[in-house]
Amino acid sequence: MRIAIVTDAWHPQRNGVVRVLATLGGKLVELGHTVEVIDPGAFATIPCPSYPEIPLALAPRRRLARMLDAFAPDAVHLATEGPLGWAGRAWALARDLPFTTAYHTKFPHYIRARTGVPLSWPYGVMRRFHGPAGAVLCPSASVHAELKEWGFTNAVEWSHGVDTTAFHPQPKDFIDLPRPLFLYVGRVAVEKNLPAFLSLDLPGSKLVVGDGPARAGLMRRFPRAHFRIANGDAELARYYAAADCFVFPSRTDTFGLVMLESLAAGVPVAAFPVSGPRDVIGDAAVGVLDEDLGRAAMAALDLSPMACRIHAQRFSWDAVARQFLGFLRPFKGALTKMSA
């Protein structure tokens, strides 16, 4: 099958959405499919407000239509709700072609955190974007339930996986800091709720690995915390493995792939009992979910690294890719090319 994936999130961005899509694309190719990823790199772009490191395609509709017509896909997946996602939606609707979408990010909650607008406004925009899709792929049962509450009728559960070869237990001497070492990995932005972690009264050390618009301010506000940026996945894997506990303070993530990567490295998780952590950790003895995040972090130190590793191995990317294929809506008959 010829599969077009349209996404506003792609390399060199470093986030969970990019990792999911890049890994998915590789697995689909391994399964014998032809995959075309259409991303902002092929377009003139402008910086995203509040996220200048994220480029947004500028007026992409015509060029995107030409690219899709030339590729002649058998199925189209719109991975994000940015300019390219809307342009892909317009292309499919103009040709009366089915498509799928994905709900990777709780943009309504991010927008409310920045502007204070009621959640109903951005959720209305999200319903409009995803409404015509044959299926809206969401990464967990919790998010699926939330979308149903907001009036989505076409959402389906599509879990994520982890590369247990890349992320695995390693010696902890990579980091020379007082123990225990409490780690956060990910974007350093307001929606990640990092002050909830960095303000905790914990023994040992707190380490943040990642970059983002809130990094400089948090470094000034929490001078006793340590901040690093990983140079590639191999180094990132060593940071994970060096930790004693992975602290995930976000209340707005749809999944939290970094938790799986930590578990694959044999490191237990402390988090709030919200969507994302509830779906990755559940009732397994590989993490502690508690509204008292400090208590969760201390309790997680007693959990088994081997149990963490075994739990992560349940999340297979091969299964994720095959499930994705089952959700696609292939076109009936050959695609008739149309001028943009």
For every predicted segment, state its role.
Residues 68, 130, 238-243, 324:
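Short alpha-helical donor nucleotide-sugar binding micro-motif in glycosyltransferases
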Residues 124-170:
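Donor nucleotide-sugar binding/catalytic pocket of nucleotide-sugar-dependent glycosyltransferases
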Residues 173-207:
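Conserved donor-binding/catalytic core segment of Leloir-type glycosyltransferases
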Residues 215-234:
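Nucleotide-activated donor-binding/catalytic signature segment of Leloir-type glycosyltransferases, i.e.
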Residues 251:
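Aromatic "clamp/platform" in nucleotide-sugar-dependent glycosyltransferases that forms part
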Residues 259, 264, 268-271:
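Short hydrophobic beta-strand element within catalytic cores of glycosyltransferases
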Residues 302-337:
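A charged, aromatic-enriched C-terminal amphipathic alpha-helix characteristic of glycosyltransferases
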